[in-house]
């Protein structure tokens, strides 16, 4: 399976979940991301485009994820990368810290396609946004707290065991195992 990402950490996480089922190779392809409020639509579109770009012979997976902030009615959601690139985590925290409702969720969707079928698998983790803490992880990890720790304070192993992407990858692994029986 080719995992379409430039993030080696995501590839390693996928390898942990899929090791007994398939090999996972990183595929660096910059597909055009459609604008949609649906993570599943974005990931499925990306997987289908990447499958063609990769030669159409090996299955591919694409993941899309976002931070959904309660006090902002779920924004930035699918637009999280754009907001992070534009404002940065510190500025997002500056906006969020004034909110009464700082509940948040990381939601992710992994899309798989082999050219014949496209399937999507979603995962989420609930938390709260807090002042930045920790030095690990990436993106919004320093401000996303789950069970008393920010994702940036957790070990990679602990974070991956809890993460939205990990939960989606576990569902993909179950589906692949059932399909291959």
Regions found by a protein language model. Name each.
Residues 2, 9-181:
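Anionic-ligand binding patches
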